[in-house]
Structure formats: C-alpha cells, structure tokens
C-alpha cells in the first residue's frame, strides 16, 4: 500500500478515469454470496466500484511481457482517481471482510487478495522514475531472457494448477551463475533508475510468488546494488494475507502460490497423471462433441464475461478446474479463455454453481447435395445452387411459391419465404475496383483510420459476423466478438487482432498507433 499512496501523490494526470468496474458487477448477489461463503457486507466491499478503466486494470494484473503497452494504454490506466479508488477499495475490504475467508474451488483466500492483486498490477505498470520516465513502458525495449523469464516461463510452468515437481528445487551454483542479472545487461542499463525501481517493485509486491523464486530475485537485487554502488530501501512484505502460517500447513494440502502469496488449498487437489503436454500448451484438439449451430440457453447464471451467443454451457461444480473442463470438452485452454474472456489464465475466478461456455455457435455448413436443416447436420441452403430456401422435407428449393414452407414464415435458416416474389439475395460488397486482381495481400494490410468516439457500424452492404469468424466482406464491427478481423480469420481486440500486419479489416492499428508513441 505504501507504493500506491506514494504514487497517488505524484501521478497528477489531468485526464480522469474513463470507465469504472466492479469485479462481480454482473453476478446475482445471492447466488454469489452463497458460492463465496461471505457476508453481505463483505460481498458489497468486494464488489466496490473502482474508478479505473476496467480492461486496463485487468490487463495490468496479468503483467505479461508478451502484451506490449502503448503510452495511451498507460495514461488511460494511470490516473490519480484510479490510484485513490484502488486504495479505497482495499480499505473497504480490509474493514468489511475482517475475519472472513473466501472459498473458491478448493482454495481458501483472504478477501484482501482481490484488491491487492489489482494494486500490485497498477503499481508496476504506472511506476515512474525521478525524471518522470515511464519505467514499464521503457522496459519493453530491454532484451534479455533473464529479466523476462519470470513472466514468460515461470507462471506457465510453476504457477498453474499442477506445477512440475522440480519447481521448488534449487539449481546448481553453475546454473545460478549464468542467471546473474549483471551478466545479462550492460551496466548502463542495469544501473539505471528505472531498471532498479522495477526490480524492487516486483519483489516488494505482495503477490510475487514466494519461495526460491523470490529468494533468487532478492539476491539479484543485492548484486545490482553492489555493482552500481547504490542502496535502495527494500521491504519484503510479510505474507499477511496467507491464511495460516506456511509451516503449519500439512504437507498433503499442497501449498499453492498460483502467482500469489494469498492462496492455499483447503483440500488437496486430485493428482493429474498424463504423458501429454499440459492442456494449455496443446494445439486445438479434434472436437468429438457436437457442433452447435444455435445459441444455448443456460440454466444457471453464466460465468462473468461468457461469450454470447454460446453453443454449449457447462455448470461448474466444486472441484472442477480449468484443466479438467478443457479435457472433458476437448478444448484447449486458449479456446476456453476465448469463450470466457473474463476468466483469469490461472482460473482463480472459476466459480462453482455458475455456467461456463465450452463451445461456440458455429456457422451452418453449406449443403453439398441439396439436403438441409437440423436433420442434415444443420446444412444451409443460402447461396447454394439448389436454391436458397429449405423446405419442410429438408431439401433446398428456390424461394417463392414452390417452397413448401408457410408463406411469410421463417424457414430453417431464419429467412422469410413469400409466396408472391422471391426475396432479394443478400448483397456482398465487391472489392474496390481500383485495386488490381492479385493485390489481395496489399488490400489485407491496408490501414484504416482510427475512429473517434464509439465504433460506427459497418454499412448495410457488409455482413456482420455471427460466430466470430470474419474476412474482407464479413465485418467484426457491430458483433460481440471484437472490432478487428485478424489474418487468421477471427474477430478480437488488441494487438493480436488489430496490430499492424495482423489485421485484415475493422479498426486496424496504424504504424503510429502500433509504435505506442504519443501522436
């Protein structure tokens, strides 16, 4: 909290927070209270409305080197109002949840863990040196496998649900020597104020993984001080939010850091025995489960942020993990996160008694033989040479009097069949005439200007994506799946979809925007 309050005094940015968020805004309070096992007063504090930009605040908690931030991103998050609001949130939880515990899928959590995680992400992202340089922004240009290995490798390997047995083993002295930070950077860089402030900020964070990793980073900080002939006060926070002293926990409970000092298992998780790669690392598995062409209706409150429409929901029960759900429904962890964007990568917010999306709504396949409808694998007639309407016998026919569907009633594909005149076929926008044939790649890389205000909808002649797939003529803008169509043909937000070279259509980043430099 000391770093946050100090930053609150120096971050005198004029622009206010552009949005606000609360962690459980869309959940039913009674169901959530029963699931978490807390009082109404504590739940109200946990659900405090934080005056920060929500997507940026969540992004900061993930703290990944694979997710580059622009200056606009940082100034959106790092406001004086956001800093003060995070501090107020922590104080409210500390007061209203005193003595309470939150139980989440076998984890016992001190409620303070939730605001502390957001505060820690904010402190790191918004850190500036005495010359007002943004340290986190500058660090994105530093190149070394040592400093970034914690973000890129350690959480994936050692902070997941089933960490390898050697995660807590110390390496040989020879291995340790090769990891000295002073052997990996130029002295001018590692003695810079930003470098040392960032290093200290990480190890002072209450959510930095405890154990050998913290010991190693602390020793490296001492080497930095000695090499740079400087001394910075260092306070390693006591794990005050760990529920029970670590040395009093029975070994069988499997003390679980999960990227934080605030979690422990209330009961040991079932061991996972497999010769395959971790589910999160697998490529897309052939899906044995049914493909869904119509939206499903959940019979429980959906997981916060679950995609809509969703082809299939699964009701989470106590003891489920993301790994077990991924395995059961033959989806990768990346796919599960795509279907449930607000789900944290370490699955700490996977709630029992809520519905999680495990399959998307897929587009109907085009008929190949003139058969159509639900009894024919959901095949659609639209655009087929057999006719664009599906009759009651499951055959494609031309729309009009010869179609057997009831007049002025929707057919199997949702089209209205008239008995007086055939409906007009949907118009697909042709490619621009001034681009010669063969220049498809250049057209895909064309940069569209960034809009001001809300994203305007595409023209009536452009189809809007119904399932997250897209191309030059099926737009993501106006769909719930994103505002950019990537080169892989899927809608989304952020650099993997909107970045220069990654974006086919929609609100693609320009070179200036992608550079992250103020315009």
Swiss-Prot record:
Residues 1-19 form the signal peptide. Residues 407-458 are annotated as: Disordered. Residues 312-358 form the LysM domain. Transmembrane segments: none annotated. PROSITE patterns: CHIT_BIND_I_1 (PS00026), CHIT_BIND_I_2 (PS50941), LYSM (PS51782). Keywords: Chitin-binding, Disulfide bond, Glycoprotein, Secreted, Signal, Virulence. Residues 314-358 are annotated as: LysM domain. Residues 467-510 form the Chitin-binding type-1 domain. It is found in: Secreted. Disulfide bonds join 470-485, 476-491, 484-498, 503-508. Residues 417-433 have a biased composition (Basic and acidic residues). Pfam families: LysM. Residues 407-416 have a biased composition (Low complexity). Gene3D superfamilies: LysM domain. The keyword Signal applies. GO terms for molecular function: chitin binding. It comes from the Eukaryota. Glycans are attached at residues 47, 460. One of its GO terms (cellular component) is extracellular region. The LysM domain binds chitin and potentially related carbohydrates, and might be involved in damping host defense. Might have a role in sequestration of chitin oligosaccharides (breakdown products of fungal cell walls that are released during invasion and act as triggers of host immunity) to dampen host defense. This is LysM domain-containing protein ARB_03442. It comes from Arthroderma benhamiae (strain ATCC MYA-4681 / CBS 112371) (Trichophyton mentagrophytes).
